[in-house]
From Swiss-Prot:
Species classification: Bacteria, Pseudomonadati, Pseudomonadota, Gammaproteobacteria, Lysobacterales
Record organism: Xanthomonas campestris pv. campestris (strain ATCC 33913 / DSM 3586 / NCPPB 528 / LMG 568 / P 25)
Protein name, entry field: Zinc transporter ZupT
UniProt keyword list: Cell inner membrane, Cell membrane, Ion transport, Iron, Membrane, Metal-binding, Transmembrane, Transmembrane helix, Transport, Zinc, Zinc transport
Topology versus the membrane: Multi-pass membrane protein
Residues the record lists as binding Zn(2+): 139, 164, 168
Gene: zupT
Cell location: Cell inner membrane
UniProt binding sites for Fe(2+): 136, 139, 165, 168, 197
Amino acid sequence: MLEVSSHNVWTALAVTLAAGLATGLGSLMVVFAKKPNPRLLAFGLAFAGGAMVFVSLSEILNKSIASFSNAYNDKLGFTYGTLTFLGGMLLIMVIDRLVPNPHQSLSTDDPQFRDDNRAYIRRVGLLTAVAITAHNFPEGLATFFATLESPAVGMPLAFAIAIHNIPEGIAIAVPVYFATRNKFYAFGASLLSGLAEPIGAGIGYLLLSSVLSEAVFGAVFGVIAGVMVFLALDELLPAAKRYAQGHETVYGLVSGMGTLAISLVLFRYAAP
């Protein structure tokens, strides 16, 4: 069994909590700020998608293969790493089918937002919060275990997930705010959904801490890589394309990949 210091655990949990709290930031944009610039939102979503795809394929999947190789051999390491990567995508596909994530964020300009239709809006807000909360559990696990093994990988991933969480906070806050006219309720609903990430991380660690090994790390990282790639391709990039009015999606995608690539190089040189 691998030994993990309590300092690393608390660091990983803090990073995961910070990423989850970004949903609250999204709700603040609804209740206090003006309507967000759709082109900037498109760029930000694509940036997060590019960052998540790059770090998943270049670092997390490689760590899965390396961990399996240390536990077995190079041939089995590559095989098991690939299989768990595909298994991660299959897992999140099943979750997505059982608890569909609302891909179309509601807008304050939507004709559904009328004073005589608050019951409908309240139901939409509840369903949106439940769906996004369910999807936040695997994201919390991804951030936690990536940071636990290597902050150089976990922190950039947490940054990408935090960007991804901002529009999720907006998606929850819009129907709640217009159903209740209460800023506190809108902020609280978004924040509680984001807290699913550190809660999911804590539950995952408690379940796996007694059996942590190279093989377990390999399986966790393989699944995480698959989940992150699926989320980027299924949620972030399509959402970015919806808001884009030009080439913001491809510019954001390339910028996200480039930024993560440079940050990982700098982390390598900064490491002792």
